[in-house]
UniProtKB/Swiss-Prot annotation:
It is an enzyme of class 2 (transferase). Residues 124-129 are annotated as: Interaction with RNA. It catalyses: guanosine(46) in tRNA + S-adenosyl-L-methionine = N(7)-methylguanosine(46) in tRNA + S-adenosyl-L-homocysteine. The gene is trmB. The active site is at residue 118. Its EC number is 2.1.1.33. Substrate binds at residues 122, 154, 191-194. Coiled coil: none annotated. GO terms for cellular component: tRNA methyltransferase complex. This is tRNA (guanine-N(7)-)-methyltransferase.
Length: 220
């Protein structure tokens, strides 16, 4: 994906510290205080321009949401969307998912979304895929017991790889869809990419993957 340079993005983000959290590590284990309330915490890695997470925050005011996006030129659009919607249950981090454990305590997150991530199709880039086992290990730490991942992609190869990765890690798969928009699944909120792909008639793949409890893993 080629990104347009927006030299003003960094300054715009810096002027909104209540929305794009600076030094997020200081809130590790205390995100409920950052939001000013106790509520389940859902995060999206690679939040892009924020259409999905803004929609989720509108539809689920009872949930606290955090979007993680490392590219400021993209994040600034998500920030403006959230500002316009006046959402108090949505915040962003201009950070890299590699550093996830620096920002969230063990078991602090209830759900994690991965939407239309870069498929990194070459074998030598496997470790960069956000469903690679090393990333799953990070997600497992920050997610609560029985926490889950909701995953969407247009890339069949990445979807098949991810199903295998989830299963090999010992996760439980739910609601696997090979054609989301022609399924009975309700409550789907589209990302920008998803809308674009859907207009072209492309299939959207979706699944939910849940980590096993220690007891469930022991009984395997």
């Amino acid at each position: 994906m080629r990104l347009r340079n927006k030299p003003w993005a960094r300054d715009a983000i810096a002027q909104n510290p209540d929305l794009v959290i600076q030094q997020p590590a200081t809130w590790k284990g205390n995100w409920h205080r950052c939001f000013g309330r106790q509520a389940p915490l859902y995060i999206e890695v690679g939040t892009g321009k924020g259409q999905f997470l803004t929609g989720m925050a509108k539809h689920h005011p009872e949930i606290n949401f955090i979007g993680i996006e490392r590219y400021e030129s993209v994040l600034v659009t998500a920030m403006e969307r959230a500002k316009e919607a006046e959402l108090t249950n949505l915040k962003f981090l201009s950070e890299d998912v590699y550093d996830l454990l620096d920002f969230f305590a063990d078991g602090e997150v209830s759900r994690l979304f991965i939407n239309f991530t870069d498929p990194w199709p070459k074998k030598r880039h496997e470790k960069r895929r956000l469903t690679y086992k090393d990333f799953l290990a990070k997600y497992e730490i920050v997610l609560k017991e029985k926490g889950d991942i909701h995953f969407k992609t247009d890339n069949q190869g990445l979807f098949e790889y991810s199903l295998h990765s989830f299963s090999k890690y010992g996760m439980i798969l739910h609601n696997v869809s090979l054609d989301l928009h022609n399924s009975d699944f309700e409550g789907n909120i589209k990302t920008e990419y998803e809308e674009k792909f859907a207009k072209k008639g492309m299939r959207i793949y979706r699944c939910e993957a849940q980590f096993r409890t220690n007891e469930e893993s022991h009984n395997l």
